[in-house]
């Protein structure tokens, strides 16, 4: 696994010494050696690499990495730029962005532009076996990503959480900082998007909150890739 070298390291360093993380590390190492696992090992911590803790403005919490090839690269909901097929949940996110902020729907699902602006695109589980959804659940990633969420909660500045669906919303008891804004909606998957994700206007609400606190809003428009 790639090393964490930015300001996330002091925030999560204690986790590496805990028994659960040693077991998790051994499990993940063995999985990569004997089967196909996504994302590529060097991309596991991309959410942290691309969005330093000191720059987090928004946290969008996903669950499991995409489990088909050429999709997962360490950012929740995002797929690699050469992947022309946009996953259904991300298609619905783009539809909501179009309705909410007038964003044009792009021809790709590569969300690094958001990460570079301070949107932490975090999954609660950071690896998965190819074609086996949820195959690395319950192995320790949840405890590690809880430590990441707790580090964000401890930041003494305005931050927005977008929590879509019950698994993401199960983290709400951890979010105790009165300076932070929690936005809740159903998951954008085709199974639940029409139950309240469409029309939630989370993106404009987040930008309004950031602007009210003197923070540069997010440019949510993802550009086309030729």
Map each language-model feature to its residues.
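A polyanion-binding, active-site-adjacent surface
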Residues: 2, 7, 14-160, 167-170, ...
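C-terminal substrate-binding/active-site "lid" region of AdoMet-derived donor-dependent transferases
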Residues: 197
């Amino acid at each position: 696994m790639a090393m964490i070298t930015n300001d996330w390291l002091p925030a999560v360093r204690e986790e590496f010494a805990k028994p659960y993380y040693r077991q998790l590390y051994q499990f993940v190492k063995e999985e990569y050696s004997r089967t196909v696992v996504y994302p590529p090992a060097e991309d596991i911590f991309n959410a942290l690499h691309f969005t330093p803790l000191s720059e987090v403005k928004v946290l969008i919490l996903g669950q499991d990495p995409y489990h088909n090839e050429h999709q997962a690269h360490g950012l929740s909901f995002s797929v690699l730029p050469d992947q022309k097929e946009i996953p259904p949940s991300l298609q619905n996110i783009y539809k909501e962005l179009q309705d909410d902020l007038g964003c044009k729907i792009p021809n790709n699902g590569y969300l690094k532009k958001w990460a570079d602006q301070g949107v932490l695109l975090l999954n609660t589980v950071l690896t998965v076996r190819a074609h086996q959804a949820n195959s690395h659940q319950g192995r320790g990633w949840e405890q590690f990503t809880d430590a990441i969420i707790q580090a964000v909660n401890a930041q003494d500045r305005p931050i927005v959480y977008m929590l879509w669906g019950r698994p993401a919303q199960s983290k709400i008891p951890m979010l105790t900082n009165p300076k932070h804004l929690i936005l809740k909606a159903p998951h954008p998957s085709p199974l639940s998007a029409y139950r309240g994700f469409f029309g939630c206007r989370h993106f404009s609400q987040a930008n309004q909150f950031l602007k009210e606190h003197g923070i540069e809003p997010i440019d949510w428009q993802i550009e086309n890739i030729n």
